[in-house]
């Protein structure tokens, strides 16, 4: 079996719709990650796009020209060496897909905020995505000023000043602003250099019991497949600690919904790992970082159409409890961003329904009691989470869910 290098860090590609996130991901990875949106019965679910990128460095040239994604140096033609392998999570920029962006953010160790120079900054989702990074505690940020090939020098400078003004007093205040053209590949070397300098590989605890956030799940069998050739269901996600080995057993929580009369309970699923896939290659052991596909012995009917996304998987008996009620310490934003008018955020009140994102899970919490900055909530769909985990909270305003702050599970 070939030794496959796994991605060491997950970087989110965030920003307003049509500002060039997917084009930039394609320029860096060669993969068009466009995501299919489909509204599933558990609220809105649109797939995140994922792609791996190998950052290559020329041993002869100096930085930033030394960095590229090519096997030979574009400047001098020397054979390049791999500096690091990284994974991009391409989050949707459309306002209705905020829930997906938030569930993708739990997989991100850093983010590239893409802002087009062709439009006034900030656009609604540019603001909302930056607030989300802040709420979820993502501090390693690089700002990319895209589409500089479509504006003159005067507008490029004006756009730069708008961005500077916009990020003042936010988590991205000190982030570098790199002007690029994703379409023509201009300044990609400078961006890669910045990623290497400013986004260190996070320290993951490989000795801890394995834990993985499930972001996707599917049935890989084609219709009409012979029974003897059927393959078990596949789950995909990111390992946040520990390692997974082919042949091991894993537990998936909250797992299966079981209805008995008028009672509903959730039962965790235990299955065996039949295969592990990383970057399109099969491996025996999967480590934290990047995205891992896990073949299992599960009935594919249980995994089709992302039905297990939002679950947590790991070594049996080591996962947190499945919670259907939680107490959170909340921190609300000052105002709602992402829409044309910015409304002041009123305090939480009893019986209010909030959309909650924790890990890759999305659920609705009904507030049973709100006092000061503490709130008790009953969850429509249970979650598997630990004390101290961060939850992004959104409130329904008009026909949209809008981010209003975050909470820490008590």
UniProtKB/Swiss-Prot annotation:
Residues 6-203 form the tr-type G domain. Mg(2+) 1 binds at residues 22, 45. Its EC number is 3.6.5.3. Residues 43-47 are annotated as: G2. Zn(2+) binds at residues 58, 61, 73, 76. Its cofactor is Mg(2+). PROSITE patterns: G_TR_2 (PS51722). InterPro entries: eIF2G (IPR050543), eIF2g_C (IPR015256), eIF2g_dom_2 (IPR044127), eIF2g_GTP-bd (IPR044128), P-loop_NTPase (IPR027417), Small_GTP-bd (IPR005225), T_Tr_GTP-bd_dom (IPR000795), TIF2_gsu (IPR022424). GO terms for cellular component: cytosol. Residues 90-93 are annotated as: G3. It catalyses: GTP + H2O = GDP + phosphate + H(+). Mg(2+) 2 binds at residues 18, 43. GTP binds at residues 18-23, 146-149, 181-183. Residues 146-149 are annotated as: G4. GO terms for molecular function: GTP binding; GTPase activity; metal ion binding; translation elongation factor activity; translation initiation factor activity; tRNA binding. Residues 181-183 are annotated as: G5. Belongs to the TRAFAC class translation factor GTPase superfamily. Classic translation factor GTPase family. EIF2G subfamily. eIF-2 functions in the early steps of protein synthesis by forming a ternary complex with GTP and initiator tRNA. HAMAP family: eIF_2_gamma. This is Translation initiation factor 2 subunit gamma.
């Amino acid at each position: 079996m070939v030794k496959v290098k796994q991605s060491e860090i997950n970087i989110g590609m965030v920003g307003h719709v049509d500002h060039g996130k997917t084009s930039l991901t394609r320029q860096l990875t060669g993969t068009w990650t466009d995501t299919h949106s489909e509204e599933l019965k558990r609220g809105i679910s649109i797939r995140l796009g994922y792609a791996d990128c190998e950052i290559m460095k020329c041993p002869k040239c100096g930085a930033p020209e030394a960095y590229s994604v090519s096997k030979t140096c574009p400047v001098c033609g020397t054979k390049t060496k791999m500096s690091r392998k990284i994974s991009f999570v391409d989050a949707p920029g459309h306002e209705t897909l905020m829930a997906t962006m938030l569930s993708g953010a739990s997989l991100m160790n850093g983010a590239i905020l893409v802002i087009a120079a062709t439009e006034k900054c900030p656009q609604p989702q540019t603001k909302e995505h930056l607030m989300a990074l802040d709420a979820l505690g993502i501090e390693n940020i690089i700002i990319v000023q895209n589409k500089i090939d479509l504006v003159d020098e005067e507008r490029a400078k004006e756009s730069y000043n708008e961005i500077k003004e916009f990020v003042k007093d936010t988590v991205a205040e000190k982030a570098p602003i790199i002007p690029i053209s994703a379409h023509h590949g201009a300044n990609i070397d400078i961006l890669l250099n910045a990623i290497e300098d400013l986004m260190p590989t996070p320290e993951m605890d490989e000795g801890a019991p394995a834990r993985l956030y499930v972001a996707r799940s599917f049935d890989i069998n084609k219709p009409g497949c012979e029974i003897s050739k059927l393959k078990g269901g596949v789950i995909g996600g990111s390992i946040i600690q520990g390692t997974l080995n082919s042949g091991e057993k894993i537990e998936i929580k909250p797992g299966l919904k079981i209805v008995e009369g008028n009672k509903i309970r959730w039962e965790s699923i235990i299955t065996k790992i039949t295969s592990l896939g990383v970057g399109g290659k099969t491996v025996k052991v999967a480590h934290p970082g990047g995205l891992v596909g896990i073949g299992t012995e599960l009935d594919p009917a249980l995994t089709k159409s992302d039905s297990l996304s939002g679950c947590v998987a790991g070594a049996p008996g080591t996962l947190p409890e499945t919670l259907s009620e939680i107490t959170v310490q909340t921190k609300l934003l000052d105002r709602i961003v992402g829409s044309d008018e910015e409304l002041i955020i009123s305090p939480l009140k009893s019986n209010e329904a909030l959309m909650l994102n924790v890990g890759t899970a999305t659920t609705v919490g009904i507030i049973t009691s709100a006092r000061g900055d503490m709130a008790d909530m009953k969850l429509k769909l249970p979650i598997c989470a630990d004390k101290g985990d961060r939850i992004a909270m959104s409130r329904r305003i008009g026909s949209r869910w809008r981010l209003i702050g975050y909470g820490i599970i008590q």
